[in-house]
């Protein structure tokens, strides 16, 4: 298995969830596992646009990341190619349902061996990312 899929029901519209992708300040609040923060250096939210950022871990470690927005289809899809190690593509699809939306997060690694070796990290990290996104967009204090 070289791909991991998670989904989360969120009590918000697909448009509101999509806005959390297109705004680098908002994206930095939820992208990454629990305890991580993001500093964006370059953010070009368009197909082929670059997103260069640094993840700051809870222990003080920093992780530079280089990505490219492969596909953007407002308000239902964002595909992001991660060109730093490990190499993968994340495709987020957002579907409106009664009472909110479902986001499906599909992370496909280039290497099956790499995916197997880090599955114990990736699976919970993806759930934490979606939990952070849900908390942000469902917050009555956060205006999107």
Regions flagged by a language model, labelled:
Residues 136-144:
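Short, highly charged C-terminal tails/helix-capping segments
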Residues 1-37, 42:
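Hydrophobic ligand-binding cavity/cleft-lining segments
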Residues 79-128, 144:
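Beta-strand/loop substructures that line and gate deep hydrophobic ligand-binding cavities in soluble
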Residues 39-81:
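Glycine-rich portal/gate segments that line the openings of hydrophobic small-molecule binding cavities
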């Amino acid at each position: 298995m070289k791909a991991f899929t998670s989904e989360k029901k969120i009590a918000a519209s697909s448009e509101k969830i999509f806005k959390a992708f297109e705004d680098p300040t908002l994206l930095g609040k939820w992208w990454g596992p629990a305890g991580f923060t993001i500093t964006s250096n370059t953010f070009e939210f368009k197909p082929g646009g670059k997103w260069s950022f640094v993840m700051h871990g809870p222990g003080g470690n920093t992780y530079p990341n280089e990505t490219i927005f492969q596909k953007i289809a407002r308000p239902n899809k964002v595909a992001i190619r991660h060109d730093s190690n490990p190499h993968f593509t994340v495709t987020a699809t957002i579907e409106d349902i009664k009472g909110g939306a479902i986001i499906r997060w599909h992370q496909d690694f280039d290497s099956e061996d790499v995916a197997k070796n880090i599955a114990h990290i990736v699976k919970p990290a993806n759930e934490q990312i979606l939990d952070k996104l849900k908390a942000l967009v469902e917050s009555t204090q956060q205006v999107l």
